[in-house]
Amino acid sequence: MWYLVLFSLLASFSAEPTMHGEILSPNYPQAYPNDVVKSWDIEVPEGFGIHLYFTHVDIEPSESCAYDSVQIISGGIEEGRLCGQRTSKSPNSPIIEEFQFPYNKLQVVFTSDFSIEEQFTGFAAYYTAIDVNECTDFTDVPCSHFCNNFIGGYFCSCPPEYFLHDDMRNCGVNCSGDVFTALIGEISSPNYPNPYPENSRCEYQIQLQEGFQVVVTMQREDFDVEPADSEGNCPDSLTFAAKNQQFGPYCGDGFPGPLTIRTQSNTLGIVFQTDLMGQKKGWKLRYHGDPISCPKESTANSNWEPDKAKYVFKDVVKITCVDGFEVVEGHVSSTSYYSTCQSDGQWSNSGLKCQPVYCGIPDPIANGKVEEPENSVFGTVIHYTCEEPYYYMEHEEGGEYRCAANGRWVNDQLGIELPRCIPVCGVPTEPFQVQQKIFGGQPAKIENFPWQVFFNHPTAGGALINEYWVLTAAHVVEKNSDPSMYAGITALRLADLENAQRLYTKRVIIHPGWKEDDDLNPRTNFDNDIALVQLKDPVKMGPKFSPICLPGTSSEYNLSPGDMGLISGWGRTEKRLHVINLRGAKVPVTSLETCKQVKEENPTARPEDYVITDNMICAGEKGVDSCKGDSGGAFAFQVPNVKAPKFYVAGLVSWGKKCGAYGVYTKVKNYVDWILKTMQENSGPRKD
């Protein structure tokens, strides 16, 4: 068994200061041992440096001298490390390596590791004391101004205007009291660009005439002041003070502050404070007087005219608010105002601000409502809704309004026009249920036929087609330009009429194709038996008041024999010439030829005298028909392709040869264009 014995030889040698000496590695010139650490502390007299020479180097080589090496250490810092086999760079000199230090102390350390594969002899070196020039050989100059060297020492001196401090190294100077009044000038630290004096406080004053501000400009390279300590405090500093503003303190290599300082003041104080240490060159600045400027952006949400990079004393600007904002002064609002740059650097009218435009409380609409907004300023969104289920909004996207820049509530589709709530047509709250086929129909509720209108004197009917218009037969109103009408009733008793909603006529418009009767003979021509009654006031829709739809013009609205429709009214029944309560019936469509074959009850009229045209519908069956008193009422049919009960007026009760058989109805589909055109031409400004 092999045992590896490791030992370490740690030694340190020092002696009294000498002017020269020799250093040899252990066992030199024999091979040095393993695992050795040995150091030599070299010291020469004060005021001298050390010159170290190596005449032999034979140490185990390794990368970065990591295994065996000789180190040269000065002030705790490694100045060199040698290993390997070195030879002289010059054939006439024994010197292999040399080091020179301006300090009087030096340490040499030799280290070997635990394993040496070959035999190495180590190193040989010697040193000598050399004179040091403290004024030039050291990084830190010992004197703040003049350094005077002699063998073994130095002394400091100052320029004539300076004095030497008690530390015999630093010079001080008195540098306060200067006042600068010119509009342009230059100021620098004492002795610039040479090192400024230590332990000094320099105060300068710049005083310009009113209306000008002091503007200081610096170049970074013109500033070299002792930097801040680890806590951020400046031992030497430059500070500016103007009114209630302070700039600085500043220190460091290169000016750390803004290169241009606009003080907004016509006076500026400058203080330069130094401590007992430092060898920096100081600073130099330039200043000039600039007309007092005012900040460019004094208001938000606005544009300035003229738009300039800089505004100065007495400049006037027009400030215009951006879209959606306005200026309010008392009860007056505007989109712009004027402001003047004042001598103190503040704008006149600085209290005015561009604030969001106020659109006010949204206007109400008829038959609808608007949500109450939290505020009514620019950008606020509100929504209008209609009173369902009796009204719907005319435009699907017409409910949302936004407070616009012009102070109006605006809809993307309608602009500033308010939305309109249109009555829902053709939808009864209680659809009519047919129980049996009887002459004169069966009792009905107004909720079955909410479009039913009663005409008094003579008794007749009409159909409400919107809030302002009633559709009826021409023969009902041809001799009455102001008919008496009621809506929302079923019974015709006097008390019922007094409580019903009276409809007042604005105008009666009879179709131009209707021929006037001569009153001498029974009427036999009912072609174009249709008229419109315009109301003075709109009808408020609800369970008892609701219009019936107009027919479409497509083929889907063509009627065929056998199609069933509803009629309603207060006409003659099998037992009574007229009835008190509203009745309804379901009636089938038949061919026009059927109506031609009905025997006339009036013996004075011949069947061939009656005019039958394509503007008419024939409907009815034995025992189920409209009769006198039902004239002008609606012949209602289910709207095509709609599952829920919804009705349109296909016909108007017009005439018949006798009751209880077949009747003739005005075909409304043929008159839709005339109806719409007439209503449009006679619709004045809405009251809603």
Swiss-Prot record:
Instruction: List the expressing tissues.
Output: Specifically expressed in male reproductive tissues.
Changes after translation: Cleaved and activated by C1R to generate Complement C1s subcomponent heavy and light chains. The iron and 2-oxoglutarate dependent 3-hydroxylation of aspartate and asparagine is (R) stereospecific within EGF domains.
Domain (CUB) spans 16-130, 175-290
**Entry keyword set:** Calcium, Complement pathway, Disulfide bond, EGF-like domain, Glycoprotein, Hydrolase, Hydroxylation, Immunity, Innate immunity, Metal-binding, Protease, Repeat, Secreted, Serine protease, Signal, Sushi
Q: Name one GO biological process term.
A: complement activation, classical pathway
Q: Where in the cell is it found?
A: Secreted; Cell surface
Report residues binding Ca(2+) 1. 60, 68, 113
In the record, (3R)-3-hydroxyasparagine modifications are located at 149
Q: Which SMART domains match?
A: CCP (SM00032), CUB (SM00042), EGF_CA (SM00179), Tryp_SPc (SM00020)
Q: Which residues are glycosylated?
A: 174
Q: Which InterPro entries match?
A: CUB_dom (IPR000859), EGF-like_Ca-bd_dom (IPR001881), EGF_Ca-bd_CS (IPR018097), Pept_S1A_C1r/C1S/mannan-bd (IPR024175), Peptidase_S1_PA (IPR009003), Peptidase_S1_PA_chymotrypsin (IPR043504), Peptidase_S1A (IPR001314), Sperma_CUB_dom_sf (IPR035914)
Q: What does this protein do?
A: Component of the complement C1 complex, a multiprotein complex that initiates the classical pathway of the complement system, a cascade of proteins that leads to phagocytosis and breakdown of pathogens and signaling that strengthens the adaptive immune system. C1S is activated following association of the C1 complex with immunoglobulins (IgG or IgM) complexed with antigens to form antigen-antibody complexes on the surface of pathogens. C1S is cleaved and activated by C1R to generate C1s subcomponent heavy and light chains.
Its assembly, as annotated, is: Core component of the complement C1 complex, a calcium-dependent complex composed of 1 molecule of the C1Q subcomplex, 2 molecules of C1R and 2 molecules of C1S. The C1Q subcomplex is composed 18 subunits: 3 chains of C1QA, C1QB, and C1QC trimerize to form 6 collagen-like triple helices connected to six globular ligand-recognition modules.
Name used for this protein in its record: Complement C1s-1 subcomponent
Q: Which gene encodes it?
A: C1s2
